[in-house]
Amino acid sequence: MKTIVFILLCFLTVSASKAQVNDLIGTWTVFEMTQISGQTSEKMTEDQFKANGAFEDYFFMEESKFKQTGNLSGEGAVSTQEGTWKIMENKVIMTLQLGEKKMDVDYTYELKENKLFLTRTSPDGNIKIIMVCRKK
């Protein structure tokens, strides 16, 4: 009986993981971004994105392939990075190829009401960025 319960739990875990992966596959565009630093909070709305010509798109592809393209780096120019992605618990981890180096960028993620919420905190814990994306 314990063996059957264990196998059933393993199957449910694998099924849930596949569902999470399938839900993320596609192109997501950032339409709202909030930066929190201490007691200060700055929000960039969809209208502000449009007015500034700003955009950031995330491409979660099959076989763990990933691409991001946009102009939010602060320089205004459009840049593209490619790599891979994976889900670990409530985090999505993008491994980006930056020249000769690889860099892991991890976000806590939540899918809610057809929106993807990506949250990242700076290593020192002082700045938190929350991006809200919708599927294209």
Protein language model regions, located:
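Lipid interaction determinants
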Residues: S17-E82, K86-K136
